Amino acid sequence: MLKNDLWINQKASEGMINPFQSNLVRHLEPNNQQKPVLSYGCSSYGYDLRLSSKEFLIFRHIPGTVMNPKKFNPDNLEKTVLHHDDDGDFFILPAHSYGLGVALEKMKVPKNITVICIGKSTYARLGIIVNTTPAEAGWEGHLTLEFSNSSGADCRIYANEGICQLLFFEGDPCTTTYKDRRGKYQNQPEKVTLAKI
């Protein structure tokens, strides 16, 4: 069953999402002015996470190399600069490229819940695809987020604003949680976690 805002708020008060925003934020009010932001916080049947400003990496081509998920070479990634202007803080994801970021919020997934992370339509309409990612029962940490820019133009990816939506699905209690089996991505810090096997 897909869980609603009442359930999300209750579980957040027990530490499921931190920091937690109980309503959907669409505007900030610095100096009493309405500043639009990419929405984040609790919605009717989900929660919009924010992208952390701490780290954003993009893939680069190294001639003569092929990326291997079993032996990932971190040299294929480069850090990007956090930019700032009147619209906010942002990273730039080049056209036809792929990047990795991390969620600002830390999560603790209950033992009978699986979370699915999906993209926001605002970014999808610009050609930015957020990889659909699960967070399994018992998983804890900051989600590493994957982004693909399928458009022919560079695109801003805003930090500290909404980047993806979480959907919470309840199932029968499982025998072994992600935490119980010591999953390889358990307790990810607020930094990009690279591929592991």
Regions found by a protein language model. Give the residues of each.
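DUTPase catalytic domain/fold
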Residues: 1-197
